[in-house]
């Protein structure tokens, strides 16, 4: 089976919080979950279902009798090299269908698949020195010749969907996308704001205390 992974070649997980004592870690997670804050600080994988999607669905259920503009927003803090594209597309579907506002906050590195999640936030914030990466990812396939051909044909459809999402969610046009798609295109938050990737830069357009 083919594995479609979108991470830069230097990809690492950022699970440093797990090195804390269990009690401290659990206390921090509960504190932020109670504030409807989700933390993406590792590679994107199948755990998005129980870690993020289920919570977004639950909060939408809790809010079903509240007008969308009166609901407590959900905030997703993102510091990730990216990861599995199938899991990424599923989480994007959940975010897009959420009637409860979902705010994404870029911090550190927002790369590849994590970048696609970020741009689908209803309101997109970033710290000044947040680094974004848009690229074509990495494909790992170990299968028969015919199955590889089948997957590559399907991969073209995936690329079309990714392109359409970027063109829809940002100010990036088709020409600029085509010129940068097969490159490792890194940029900071100020360039992201110019490209329509970032809505607000923390410390310039919004204060940190106003996010939560």
What are these regions (language model features)?
Residues 1-212:
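Terminal-region recognition feature
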């Amino acid at each position: 089976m083919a594995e479609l992974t979108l991470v830069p070649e230097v990809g690492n997980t950022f699970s440093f919080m797990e090195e804390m004592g269990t009690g401290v870690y659990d206390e921090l997670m509960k504190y932020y979950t109670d504030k409807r804050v989700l933390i993406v600080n590792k590679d994107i994988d199948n755990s998005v279902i129980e870690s993020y999607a289920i919570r977004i669905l639950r909060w939408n259920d809790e809010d079903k009798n509240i007008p969308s503009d009166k609901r407590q927003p959900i905030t997703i803090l993102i510091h990730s090299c990216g990861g599995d594209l199938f899991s990424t597309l599923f989480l994007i579907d959940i975010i897009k269908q959420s009637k409860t506002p979902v705010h994404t906050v870029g911090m550190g590195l927002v790369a590849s698949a994590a970048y696609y999640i970020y741009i689908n936030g209803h309101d997109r914030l970033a710290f000044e020195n947040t680094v974004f990466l848009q690229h074509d990812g990495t494909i790992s396939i170990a299968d028969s010749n015919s199955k590889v051909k089948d997957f590559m044909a399907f991969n073209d459809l995936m690329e079309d969907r990714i392109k359409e999402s970027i063109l829809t969610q940002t100010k990036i046009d088709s020409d600029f996308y085509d010129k940068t798609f097969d490159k490792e295109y890194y940029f900071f938050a100020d360039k992201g704001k110019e490209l329509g990737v970032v809505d607000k830069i923390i410390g310039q357009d919004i204060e940190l205390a106003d996010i939560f």
